[in-house]
Amino acid sequence: MLMLFVFGVLLHEVSLSGQNEAPPNTHSIPGEPLYNYASIRLPEEHIPFFLHNNRHIATVCRKDSLCPYKKHLEKLKYCWGYEKSCKPEFRFGYPVCSYVDMGWTDTLESAEDIFWKQADFGYARERLEEMHVLCQPKETSDSSLVCSRYLQYCRATNLYLDLRNIKRNHDRFMEDFFQSGEIGGHCKLDIRTLMSEGQRKSPLQSWFAELQSYTQLNFRPIEDAKCDIVIEKPTYFMKLDAGVNMYHHFCDFINLYITQHVNNSFSTDVYIVMWDTSSYGYGDLFSDTWNAFTDYDVIHLKTYDSKRVCFKEAVFSLLPRMRYGLFYNTPLISGCQNTGLFRAFAQHVLHRLNITQEGPKDGKIRVTILARSTEYRKILNQNELVNALKTVSTFEVQIVDYKYRELGFLDQLRITHNTDIFIGMHGAGLTHLLFLPDWAAVFELYNCEDERCYLDLARLRGVHYITWRRQNKVFPQDKGHHPTLGEHPKFTNYSFDVEEFMYLVLQAADHVLQHPKWPFKKKHDEL
């Protein structure tokens, strides 16, 4: 039976246990639904895609007069894109390419396909196609280990961790944390294949360092009572990037979301364990976001120190800085934008955090300027720029400073999601562009010679991006003073030509008004 389970993982026919795999209650109390539909907690637009991959729930819904999703049963051909049976015309979305990057390919069609595989649900499909069994179970109570290439993602059953003798220091990602016999399972290990997957061994790129000591045990950890603690709930292991930087931390969250797709499970009845081999804590300015993925507090690995811990189902999540991963330093083909994956991620997070769209307002464009209270990259003539914006009657202007001590992250998201033009200097705060409405524009006031970072993120999300172009109309305070590198454009402050600024903002406004998803189609002649 477990053999079928493992092969099911390879074929993407089995989901991680949790809400998606809960057996429908076909003997429910009269007047009660046959399934706990409220546990699905997905945006309405995502429901047909969920039902496509969970046909058992679709079948129950069809029979259940109380199912709220009956209208979606006629759309079961809709699919995310990574499913083997998914036809391109039914995918959640498809990128748009405006020109061909001849360094990559020679047709628009192939450019779209490349971008889809680099940064859209095609990326999830490639991870699924890489899956192979590294530790083969023979019986139902055995363990298993299934991984993608380079051990960037793994899934284990009946996993044994022995933390009785571990030693912690200042290193968050020790490579020799476990010795032979301290991590493993009762299954037939293909040690040769396991050891061949270490080419990308690196803390935030692979799980090879953690799993290279995986051992074929001569006992069944749970059945033979070798565990001090047995974790029944599905558990995600994650190695986290910087929790104080939104750009880096959201590489964690997007990869957790992709991992959920690979598992075909969006249940929040799961544990998340932060894999950290140090004794330190973890500063997290965006901890509210975890509520989109789990009902429980994030667990530090050190919680289990001095114990033998067994996990019935464990997932080693995709990592934040993988080579050719998403979205840190990802090489992307030029000329393409708008991935369904990043749009779905934004919708998923906003839905689960109860962030709603309160507008837009007819006759108004909501403009938000992100101010900086840091030492560098301040807008020196900010008041002058704001006063110029206020001369346009259709602009509703607000200035915000996303300081976590004064404005919680959920409140920040509410402001961002209810913004039509988002303006800010180069910096991690621009990662908020992920949560702008589809019709919005982001104006990176000055990119400080880091041209690709937020341009590429805007392309991934599918929102319009503009930045300052005329160097003779931006005025740095000085040449910048990096602590070790000397002169550096990110380490100074700037003022801007007001006329050029207004020209660019009006361009952004024109894009907003012309966007197909802008609810008000009439002309705004006042602009």
UniProtKB/Swiss-Prot annotation:
Look up and give the organism this protein is from: Pan troglodytes
List, alphabetically, the InterPro entries matched. Glyco_transf_61_cat, Glycosyltransferase_61
- Annotated protein name in UniProt: EGF domain-specific O-linked N-acetylglucosamine transferase
As for family, the record states: Belongs to the glycosyltransferase 61 family.
Q: Name one GO biological process term.
A: protein O-GlcNAcylation via threonine
Q: What is its EC number?
A: 2.4.1.255
Provide GO CC annotations from the record.
Answer: endoplasmic reticulum lumen
Which compartments is it annotated to reside in? Answer: Endoplasmic reticulum lumen
Q: Which residues form the signal peptide?
A: 1-17
User: Where do we find the motif Prevents secretion from ER here?
Assistant: 524-527
Q: Describe the reaction catalysed, as an equation.
A: L-seryl-[protein] + UDP-N-acetyl-alpha-D-glucosamine = 3-O-(N-acetyl-beta-D-glucosaminyl)-L-seryl-[protein] + UDP + H(+); L-threonyl-[protein] + UDP-N-acetyl-alpha-D-glucosamine = 3-O-(N-acetyl-beta-D-glucosaminyl)-L-threonyl-[protein] + UDP + H(+)
